[in-house]
Amino acid sequence: MQTAMGDDIIDRISSRLLREPEAFDPAAGMLPDWVPDTPPGRPPVPAAVLIALVRRAEGLSILYTERSPELRSHSGQIAFPGGKVDPTDSDAADAALREAWEEVHLQRSEARVLGFMPLYYTGTNYLITPVVAVVEPTAPFIPNPGEVRSVFEVPLDYLMTPGSYSTFHIKRGGREHSTWQIEHSGLVIWGITANLTRRFHDLALQPETGRSAEGG
């Protein structure tokens, strides 16, 4: 029964995703999630993250990592597996799956890419392509201690509930900036990861309007 219900949800999500990674159009004037006082003055850095829908006996969940406290940037924060798109990566999906293997030993053969969410531009000048995939693991995920402190999953049902989200306010450059925040099992997901999770929530619950997602 859980498998049938899970398949229905997966089909629904898949129908709302882009079939190909969204191309960046510099002329479109895309704004970042927050605007720094000093614009970077260089093209944004392509990056990709994996939003992994993990199939378990009890239902679907989404995979997150707790970054190592030893990392120079975003240490100790909650994140999706992912990172910069390397020149050797064929596309965003290739980059996201490579990073997932390097970070948590997620086997590429156990992942089926459903599609892509619209680009997410960060105030730190990263242009992120969220890659959505169904994962059916045959072994536990193993954190790479050089990058990841721990790995955990949050039930999809919980993340599809609007009441699971609140807003979090921080200051950058003397200006207040708000992000989404998710609390679960004593852990707090905020910033880019929470914003992307909320976008995924909104995308999954939006009315059916066509074969693939539009906007973000």
Which ranges hold each PLM region?
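N-terminal leader/linker segments that precede catalytic domains of diphosphate-processing enzymes
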Residues: 1-79, 84-138, 172-216
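NUDIX/MutT-family hydrolases
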Residues: 143-185
